[in-house]
């Protein structure tokens, strides 16, 4: 376990963040491999099916990750407060809660896969493959949820290396699975979904074995595996984050539906662009996750000034890397899109979206670091509220308006993300200054 309450903030934050970033890169990589292999060896309908279906899976995964953030923050806080004996009941209660969530997701994704595909306005020729992708991923949702919860537990313990190993295993298995099922057996989108589920299953087995063998500073008993007071505590932290993430990802699903109305090429191009966007957002996402744990442990130890310095350090790291990512996405986005598809029209449509989205790579460095700071302080209701405002008042209305124009442009639709993020930064700066003023007065 890593002690974040002393020593160089920059060095320790980077040391903790790099494995998280590595895990996110590998996670995005095995998602991208699905699209890459289907794009090269499958059909255009299969590519659209994976593109649209993976948007649904991303929604589920990101919401579960944010809900599990409550476990991460609470474990880190108890470590800072030297109350390790409380952690066993967090893990036991979390297992029960997320098992119930998995059961609900299983029923919805398997039983309503086709209506979901239709709701997403998947192109008519891709509805069947989109539904198949969603149904297969839904059948394996227990493994997908379990992986994210186990990773949250390890990060809360200050161990970001183990989740990196878990996703490395999943990535290798998924690549092999895609090559065998899609390129070899011609299973198209269904093969990609099967490879994803099997990879997550093996990763979960590996994670459980590592947790059991790990020398833990607490004990877990059978009595911990029930609804207990810790469940309410981590849900109080995680639920607002999950709702905020649900609406954010939901807005991107709506965006996907807006784009799908523009035709198969636009749908496939947007899917390709989304995979590149996933990679571009990895640094801010890693910063938010690492900052949340870092800040939470310091808040638990009463080191509020150090917690604030952590936020500003995160912003600096994010902006430095964000400049490079912005240049790459804005000026060479066509080359990036060409990695995922050999269809010139699909590549061009993907690049159109990326040019509008590019400023987001800089703005999220600020926004996500601030969100990590608020998460670590337990201000997750605020994180939810600012996300609601961004989504409902800016991102969705702007994207919808741009999508219904006679000469609808994917570049203009892509601008919805950076414009809403800029608005979110203003809101978060105002909240930070308000809390600082209130703290000085008290």
Could you tell me what each predicted segment is?
Residues 4-36, 40-41, 55-70, 74, ...:
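N-terminal transmembrane alpha-helices
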Residues 1-17, 75-142, 184-239, 295-360, ...:
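Short alpha-helical transmembrane segments in multi-pass integral membrane proteins
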Residues 59-62, 174-178, 203-208, 279-282, ...:
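Hydrophobic transmembrane alpha-helices of multi-pass small-molecule transporters
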Residues 18, 22, 53-59, 96-100, ...:
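Hydrophobic residues within alpha-helical transmembrane segments
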Residues 15-34, 136, 170, 199-203, ...:
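Transmembrane helical elements of multi-pass membrane transporters/channels
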Residues 25, 29-48, 117-124, 180-187, ...:
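Helix-terminus/linker motif at the lipid-water interface of multi-pass membrane proteins
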């Amino acid at each position: 376990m890593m002690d974040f309450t002393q020593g160089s903030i920059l060095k320790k934050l980077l040391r903790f963040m790099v494995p998280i970033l590595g895990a996110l890169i590998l996670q995005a990589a095995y998602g991208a491999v699905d699209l890459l292999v289907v794009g090269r060896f499958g059909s255009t309908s299969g590519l659209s099916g994976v593109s649209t279906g993976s948007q649904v899976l991303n929604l589920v995964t990101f919401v579960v990750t944010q809900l599990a953030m409550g476990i991460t923050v609470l474990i880190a806080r108890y470590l800072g407060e030297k109350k390790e004996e409380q952690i066993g009941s967090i893990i036991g209660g979390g297992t029960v809660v997320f098992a119930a969530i998995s059961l609900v997701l299983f029923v919805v994704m398997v039983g309503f896969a086709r209506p979901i595909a239709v709701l997403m306005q998947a192109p008519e020729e891709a509805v069947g493959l989109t539904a198949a992708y969603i149904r297969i991923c839904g059948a394996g949702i227990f493994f997908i949820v379990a992986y994210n919860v186990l990773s949250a537990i390890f990060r809360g313990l200050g161990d970001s290396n183990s989740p990196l190993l878990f996703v490395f295993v999943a990535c290798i298995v998924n690549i092999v699975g895609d090559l065998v099922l899609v390129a070899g057996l011609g299973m198209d989108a269904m093969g990609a979904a099967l490879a994803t589920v099997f990879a997550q299953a093996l990763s979960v087995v590996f994670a459980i074995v590592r947790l059991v063998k790990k020398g833990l500073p607490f004990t877990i008993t059978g009595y911990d595996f029930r609804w207990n007071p810790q469940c309410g505590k981590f849900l109080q932290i995680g639920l607002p984050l999950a709702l905020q993430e649900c609406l954010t990802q939901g807005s991107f699903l709506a965006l996907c539906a807006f784009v799908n109305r523009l035709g198969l090429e636009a749908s496939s191009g947007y899917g390709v662009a989304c995979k590149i966007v996933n990679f571009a957002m990895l640094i801010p996402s890693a910063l938010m996750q690492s900052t949340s744990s870092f800040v939470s442990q310091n808040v638990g130890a009463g080191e509020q000034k150090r917690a604030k310095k952590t936020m500003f350090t995160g912003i600096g790291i994010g902006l430095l890397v964000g400049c490079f990512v912005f240049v790459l996405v804005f000026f060479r986005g066509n080359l990036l899109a060409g990695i995922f598809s050999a269809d010139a029209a699909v590549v061009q449509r993907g690049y159109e979206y990326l040019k509008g989205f590019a400023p987001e790579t800089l703005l999220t460095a600020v926004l996500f670091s601030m969100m990590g700071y608020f998460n670590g302080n337990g201000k997750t209701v605020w994180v939810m509220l600012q996300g609601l405002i961004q989504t409902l008042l800016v991102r969705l209305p702007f994207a919808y308006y741009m999508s219904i124009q006679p000469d609808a442009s994917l570049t203009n639709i892509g601008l919805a993300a950076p414009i809403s993020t800029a608005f979110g930064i203003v809101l978060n700066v105002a909240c930070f200054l308000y809390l600082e003023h209130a703290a000085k007065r008290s």
